[in-house]
Amino acid sequence: MSLLTHLATIDDPRRDINKKHELLDLLFLTVSAVMSGAEGWKDIKQFGDEKLDWLRRYRPFANGMPVDDTIARVVRALDPEQFNRAFLNWVNEVRAASGQEQIALDGKTSAKRP
């Protein structure tokens, strides 16, 4: 399954009236930005502004890029265990498919210890 498929299992904590941006758009943006080095809400927003064309290859972002306060509010409202489970399930699936014992998300390799 793809990252998007795993992220789609996460429940949206918002009421319908407060859903200008799709949850899956926000989650995909946040994970992509953090995996690319973003360290805060403003970094995530900046990544989204700079990479909107790339992000739209995978998700519509029909209402454009959310502001950093929206990103923060929605991510903080998520069930952390549910998010963690979805993300780790995806990582483990990628790891198993690649035949690796572990995956370095920071781009570094680890030396095997004797």
List where the protein language model places each region.
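Dynamic "connector" segments at or just before major functional cores
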Residues: 1-113
